[in-house]
Amino acid sequence: MLQFSTFLVLLYISISYVLPLYATSQPEGSKRDNPRTIKSRMQKLTIMLISNLFLVPFLQSQLSSTTSHISFKDAFLGLGIIPGYYAALPNPWQFSQFVKDLTKCVAMLLTLYCGPVLDFVLYHLLNPKSSILEDFYHEFLNIWSFRNFIFAPITEEIFYTSMLLTTYLNLIPHSQLSYQQLFWQPSLFFGLAHAHHAYEQLQEGSMTTVSILLTTCFQILYTTLFGGLTKFVFVRTGGNLWCCIILHALCNIMGFPGPSRLNLHFTVVDKKAGRISKLVSIWNKCYFALLVLGLISLKDTLQTLVGTPGYRITL
């Protein structure tokens, strides 16, 4: 059972990320994808982030029990924001292990997305009119991509993985904790935090109430599930926050797998017949098989590629 003071800290961390999104001076009705709105929100979230990097460790140090007291310094370092620093180890500076953990987590994600990754490669190899550099320019070099692929993964993982998990670990006796609690209770805070998008959609008036409700429920569900993944990674890698950030960023980039881009190009944009059409049809079947294979392999890759024995957070 959570102590009330611990619950208040967890609630504060969750709410403190959402509140700055609405504490803007933008005109009423300004949409979330308006560049001015994005800049204003990122500025205010940055201020809140810097404040919480000191406030949350301070609260943890003040509220931790006398039998398992944690200092402000240890609470701050335990957030995992310093690359290569493993706070729980006798020799905390382990940069080679840090790089190894990052590499293994990326390999795990590439296995999950093996279908879309191979489809991307084949599309650019077999379509002479395509340009990776042009795709990169249009996809990444703008403020929306900076928010989605860099700013959001960093800030959300610091708030909803690092700060929430370390609050559990530092304020609740480990004898009263289970890994299931660590993986799913903080993830629920992360999922519910996305409910505010329903308010934005209502303000825009572009969707029906039923559509907003269904979309919000689905968003809460998949963000809670994704939160469980990043909490698992944080624990298994001994508090390597940057593994969680990289995974979050890559998942935002990849998104939910859609139809094969190669198949769409050669069946809709530049329709081919004969042998090429048959080969594209075969690839399309292979693509969907790889999607299923990547999902099935996730359980095994999580166990084999995430973390190293001796570096994990133990209860």
Curated annotation (Swiss-Prot):
Disulfide bonds: none annotated. It comes from Saccharomyces cerevisiae (strain ATCC 204508 / S288c). This is CAAX prenyl protease 2. Belongs to the peptidase U48 family. Protease involved in the processing of a variety of prenylated proteins containing the C-terminal CAAX motif, where C is a cysteine modified with an isoprenoid lipid, A is an aliphatic amino acid and X is any C-terminal amino acid. Proteolytically removes the C-terminal three residues of farnesylated proteins, leaving the prenylated cysteine as the new C-terminus. Target proteins include the a-factor mating pheromone and RAS. Its substrate specificity is overlapping but distinct with that of STE24. The gene is RCE1. The active site is at 156 (proton donor/acceptor), 194 (proton donor/acceptor). Keywords: Endoplasmic reticulum, Hydrolase, Membrane, Pheromone response, Protease, Transmembrane, Transmembrane helix. InterPro entries: Rce1, Rce1/LyrA-like_dom. Residues 1-3, 66-74, 127-148, 230-237, 297-315 are lumenal. It comes from the Eukaryota. The record marks 248, 252 as: Transition state stabilizer. It is a multi-pass membrane protein. It holds the Pfam family Rce1-like.
